[in-house]
């Protein structure tokens, strides 16, 4: 990733996280005067410390300094050196200043008068001397100490927005001490809601529902389908109009040049004055005609461009209207899983994440059917019985997790269980017994290829038909449904730990961003989400591994395949034509050689039916282009399966040392920053938000290295290191502590706890991290 782009991304993420963090801090500060003060102080201290570390990591010195000063006030309050009421007031005001700095990061490095004054105020309250901020403006000390502040409550926007703590009865403020708004406070935020002011709180929900109902109508899905197709066709037609407009302009240019040539020729020949005068009038008319023509073309261009833009917006709105939240079908799953597990004498918990993400409504039925089958498989085949789980040391209740995320135009739905996993050897034997493959073929299968046997029609490892599954409708049906929608299915599993099935689907069937390439005179498209890079294959980058052609891509050998012959096309591309598209599917990559690139654009997709897919397995659909041609859209998963079959030796080439690293930090900013460094070294990263979660992950997975922060909820980094080193099964995994705590005492505590290395976050870089990792692994 580009360094500047990464920094912008991290700063944006910092702003989002810090806004939520400040809300938590303010709620915690308000609890300092309550019975839960000890827990509140601990929570506030952790949030302030994490914010300070994140800010310093991103070079936001003013925010880091202000958070540090706030920590001092909190510590003084806990030690009884500062009155709780005074500490509460000043910490809330500090939150306001931090919020202002966070909204506009331009002053978050060197600070501004408000932040500098706030640091001094915090230092006075805590009895500390504030250190200077690097790059800050020197400020003269005040000539005399300020007068004691008037004890008046301070109302801030965040405080107004925060949910009130429960009370026994409403308490009115004293009439002589009206709340005073800070200069930066928004009056609208402080104003009471009209309904609440008149005692009509209960009427608000019904009024809101009525307002929503007034803005909503039911639309038949067939109407939306027709609108989607029409919008796509109109978009293509408007693009053709733009093309014709460009061609018209080029035609007028040719006409203008021809007129100029004619007039120059007339000037060179000897003609009478009368003819000369007529030619002059013709010249004048030609210039007027040319000017009128160009004005017409420009007006036409403007109109067509406006039309095209509006049609593009309309197509986007239609595509958005087709999206419905997955919760529409997910809401029925908890009860379904409960009933399935009861029939099996099992207890299974279902966890669903991000069910509010939308999917094309025409896909809902197929998505529901596929997921129901996956849930049935997880309950029946995956999760063990309570007795077996108890013997294995697992929780008696099994767990199935449905996780949804969006990656570009594609939707990823993962169904994960913590059951017995999939045994590749058992699948090989089942395939042999069912005569799907012979023993030689089974032995040649890699572990992943053996697991993918579950997608063979009629394949099952069950000898008996159960009430729940095993009735001849298998994973091949799931795969076929998903691929008919232009998607793909992936599976990963670890014996004894569970399995994960991932459905990868287009979020919308109306429009898709594709990369268009040329093979001969024809145009083909690949989903942009499947394209990792485009490149020109240099002779020096080509290599041969075990008789298979490959190319170096990002330092690793990648199968090099001519796309034309793979699709069964005669002639066309050869390896002396350098353009190539690097596509990916799961962990597989391939460089597909083409004849040329066209461009990347959004197209209206017309999917092919299942019968067509059987006859042409590499084809996912078609799209009309503005020049009248039809682009054939390729199904990358099928192509990658064929490439894997053709280029199997490439996957057997010796790979560079690649570690599986567990990164433990409660700060998402720190995880993103440190994770980028680890990935830059070529290693894979998994994350945990605290020591407790990390220890569970280590028990259930295999890692080559653990990087951990120190100050975290539930289980801190020192305690995590001690627990890991006292557990024989994982004691040999190297542990590196990454912390903003830089004192010799902190480093000694980390190493005494069992850490193999202690690195300070402020000094962290690729070289420092690489040296530590190389030394320990």
UniProtKB/Swiss-Prot annotation:
SMART domains per the UniProt record, alphabetical: CheW, HATPase_c, HPT, REC
Gene3D superfamilies: 3.40.50.2300, Histidine kinase-like ATPase, C-terminal domain (3.30.565.10), HPT domain (1.20.120.160), SH3 Domains (2.30.30.40)
Residue ranges with Low complexity bias: 178-197
Domain called CheW-like: residue spans: 511-645
EC category name: transferase
GO MF annotation list: ATP binding; protein histidine kinase activity
Disordered: annotated span: 129-149, 164-212
Membrane-traversing stretches: none
EC number annotated for this UniProt entry: 2.7.13.3
Domain of life of the organism encoding this protein: Bacteria
Residue numbers carrying Phosphohistidine: 49
GO biological process: chemotaxis; phosphorelay signal transduction system
Residue span(s) of domain HPt: 1-108
Domain Histidine kinase: start-end pairs: 270-509
Positions carrying 4-aspartylphosphate: 709
Reaction equation(s) it catalyzes: ATP + protein L-histidine = ADP + protein N-phospho-L-histidine
Biased composition (Pro residues): 139-149, 164-177
The protein's role, per its UniProt record: FrzE is involved in a sensory transduction pathway that controls the frequency at which cells reverse their gliding direction. FrzE seems to be capable of autophosphorylating itself on a histidine residue and then to transfer that group to an aspartate residue in the C-terminal part of the protein.
Protein name: Gliding motility regulatory protein
Lineage: Bacteria, Pseudomonadati, Myxococcota, Myxococcia, Myxococcales
